[in-house]
Amino acid sequence: KRAFYFLATTESEAQSMKRFAGVLSRTTKNPMLSKVTFTDWLDLFQVVADDHPDEKKVLVIDEFPYLVKTNPDFPSILQNAWDEVLKDHNVMLVLCGSLISMMKKHALAYDSPLYGRRTAQIRLMPLQFTDVYAAQNLSFEQAVEQYAITGGVPKYMEFFQTDEPLVEQIRRVVLSKNGFLYEEPDFLLNEEVQTPINYFSVLKAISDGNHKLSKIGMTMEQDTSAITPYLKTLIDLGFVIKNVPITEKNPERSRKSLYYVSDNFIRFWFRYVYPFKGELELDNQQIVLDEMGKDFKQKFVAFAYESICRNIFAELCRKGQIDFEPSRIGSYWCNDNEGDTEIDVAAVDNQHKRLFLGECKYHAKPEDV
């Protein structure tokens, strides 16, 4: 298929139109298009429609939210262009964006001008551990510890593809003021939400080990009703996950819900970077490395290892290496007369009425059975 690809940036609408015309000029091999000053998006989209009208074409607009930031009416402009120009001219329109909240609001939401015109949507998720491990030349231990930090986000993984010891990679990429990931959560939250400070407070409270709604509220000194909207947004953005025991029949109404930071890197950042930003600004990286020496493997990696084990279990079931057809995979916990019970890997096979229970431990030495 003939393809037009346009990457939007933070620039004026006139500059965007000029660059879009350049894309059309290069793709159609018509140098005159780059010399024309376009003032109407509809004219630009008409060029796409008129190019090889009998052939199927793909028009990809990447970072679509930036065009909306420049001109809030752009979704309406695009709706008109689709209905009047593109729809009946063999054009497949693909909108991409890294700002989840804006993609939902301006492309998927019921009140968006584009609502009802999509034929599919794909939310790209981080890579699963089994896929990452299969593609890397790392020992199992190295892969687990790297994944505990990157969470399978390809861009983050790029910065950990060296032969350096992991601690040196962390120092260079995360702890250095010039490191690519030093301020990553700041950038993400500032782009996605309007009042980052409240979301920071929620993430910090959860990262400090407060997983019940009541404890998060107590830590923030706010009523639970006040922080629930923040939690919902963080869940929608993929930063937080709400877990309930695997056996709960009505998860949405469960009183056993626990909240966790689901993004591995954000969890790492709030645990080891955020509390020591003052020291890191003074280039004192050793204080973080000393803090990591206390519990990085025993607690931080061990927690991530539980979700890794659930991923491995799902993959083994899929391949038929474990005779189990899971309907749901998660974990289980309860409080009884004998104390707290926690099961790291719990799965339900509704078809055969079976339950799978497993425990996973991440230690330096093999665990006795």
Predicted regions and their residues:
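Phosphate-binding site recognition
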Residues: 1-290
